[in-house]
Amino acid sequence: MTPLIFVTGGVVSSLGKGIAAASLAAILEARGLKVTMMKLDPYINVDPGTMSPFQHGEVYVTDDGAETDLDLGHYERFVRTRLSRKNSVTTGRIYENVIRKERRGDYLGATVQVIPHITDEIRRCIDEATEGYDVALVEIGGTVGDIESLPFLEAIRQVRTERGPEKALFMHLTLVPYIGAAGELKTKPTQHSVKELRSIGIQPDVLLCRSEQAVPDSERRKIAQFTNVSERAVISVPDVDVLYRIPSGLHAQGLDEIVVNQLKLADKVGPVDLSMWEDAVDATLHPLDEVTIAVVGKYVDHQDAYKSVGEALKHGGLRQRTKVNLKWLEAQDLEGTDMAALADVDGILVPGGFGDRGFEGKVLTSKFAREQQVPYFGICYGMQAAVVDYARNVVGLEGANSTENDRQSPNPVIGLITEWRTATGDVEKRDDKSDLGGTMRLGLQEQRLKPGTLARELYGKDVVAERHRHRYEFNNRYRTQLEDAGLVIAGKSMDDTLVEVVELPRDAHPWFLACQAHPEFLSTPRDGHPLFIGFIRAARERKAGGKLLQEVRA
């Protein structure tokens, strides 16, 4: 039976439960434990795949093709465990499972209720996702007091009652606001949040107190007194200048020791090694170079929509001790302009997206990068924009477009995928009348790279695997025509049916590469990702006037 750490949040949302949980997981992993993580989301959607990026932020994709909450991206960037569909559960999925069982007759005619049927299904999902690990962290989305969260909170209360404190620990993240007019921190919101939690039968073992500044010992004692939590388990989590400081900050206050002692893990752990995180902090604070990258997207007003892209760019800089400044630009705003907003950047990245809004701005961005010799990295929709630009402006295919945006295009160089293999090798089919949810090409897919290409050089091997999330693809009818005009097809699916990577010859452009996959989902601060590292290096070389640079490793 895997020991569980349940992470809840109070007072307000967006306090950083996911980062806090991932930081603790990183410490426990650094002490030699096999760790996994899980997110329980209280919304009714089956998954976030069809949710607006403006509301929900990024949809993170796992190896097995699950469309999940962006917190799973935090988890995978902080710990080495590769997560799956089991690690992201929503209210919608829980109810879907229960209703399916009821229709099959699994409940033998019983009246199906929240307790015990919904809570039992939640507990079953927790057991399934956490089995076989030394310890698991389970984050409950939302805020204590939300009506949507009640079934999840009741389920974890039951787990604690049955397993006891040595197999289930409650960690509550709360806000300790600083009131500038009074010049002091206020603990009352935390007291009320814990009171709310205790009213439903959950007594926190650990409090993580989020604040603008460190919570002084006097306030920690006060919080401990009013919440029935040990003073040493009231942990201060102030704002930090570098995210990678958090594991060291939590370890310095003994959080991992509290967990190890309560969950009886002492015989499994060794001394902690946080050198990787310390090196990341040092490389971030003491860069040797600096570049500016334009990210031209559709949802830039809500930067969480491109969370993994932003992190992967920073990881690419981290491996070279280079500070990466991000210039977020709305693609639609570039349409009809002279593209002056891109004049001062060292590299351009065009990330994924859906729908016709802003697509022409992405095409113009690709054209600008191609003609002005600016390093260009296109991802998913960014690759499709690059192909459309090349077809229109180099090959001369009038009206070239994606059928996603123009079904009547005379030259549909990007079209709907009607058949493909899933991450497990099964054949999937769809048409333009299929449901939007769960009908894309999703998950980890292998691709073969062409010898002598930039992509092959960056990856350093012939066959690579990347995660995908798309339903439109390069139209093979135009493959030969575009190749004859100079476009390099650098990567294809293993069955040779889908174009995965395109680039320009290096004698025509210093660094122009676009891929259909989402390599940002496999980038971590430990290793970065070869495409992002190569892109940042190209941006550095452009800034240095084309001079080849010595690689500097963090």
Swiss-Prot record:
ATP binds at residues 14-19, 71. Residues 1-265 are annotated as: Amidoligase domain. Pathway: Pyrimidine metabolism; CTP biosynthesis via de novo pathway; CTP from UDP: step 2/2. It catalyses: UTP + L-glutamine + ATP + H2O = CTP + L-glutamate + ADP + phosphate + 2 H(+); L-glutamine + H2O = L-glutamate + NH4(+); UTP + NH4(+) + ATP = CTP + ADP + phosphate + 2 H(+). InterPro entries: Class_I_gatase-like, CTP_synthase, CTP_synthase_N, GATASE, GATase1_CTP_Synthase, P-loop_NTPase. One of its GO terms (molecular function) is ATP binding. Its EC number is 6.3.4.2. UTP binds at residues 13, 186-191, 222. Signal peptide: none annotated. Allosterically activated by GTP, when glutamine is the substrate; GTP has no effect on the reaction when ammonia is the substrate. The allosteric effector GTP functions by stabilizing the protein conformation that binds the tetrahedral intermediate(s) formed during glutamine hydrolysis. Inhibited by the product CTP, via allosteric rather than competitive inhibition. Pfam families: CTP_synth_N, GATase. L-glutamine binds at residues 353, 381-384, 404, 471. GO terms for cellular component: cytosol. It comes from the Bacteria. GO terms for biological process: 'de novo' CTP biosynthetic process; pyrimidine nucleobase biosynthetic process. Keywords: ATP-binding, Glutamine amidotransferase, Ligase, Magnesium, Metal-binding, Nucleotide-binding, Pyrimidine biosynthesis. PROSITE patterns: GATASE_TYPE_1 (PS51273). Catalyzes the ATP-dependent amination of UTP to CTP with either L-glutamine or ammonia as the source of nitrogen. Regulates intracellular CTP levels through interactions with the four ribonucleotide triphosphates. Belongs to the CTP synthase family. CTPSs have evolved a hybrid strategy for distinguishing between UTP and CTP. The overlapping regions of the product feedback inhibitory and substrate sites recognize a common feature in both compounds, the triphosphate moiety. To differentiate isosteric substrate and product pyrimidine rings, an additional pocket far from the expected kinase/ligase catalytic site, specifically recognizes the cytosine and ribose portions of the product inhibitor. Homotetramer. NCBIfam families: PRK05380.1, PyrG. This is CTP synthase. It comes from Stenotrophomonas maltophilia (strain R551-3). The lineage of its organism: Bacteria, Pseudomonadati, Pseudomonadota, Gammaproteobacteria, Lysobacterales.
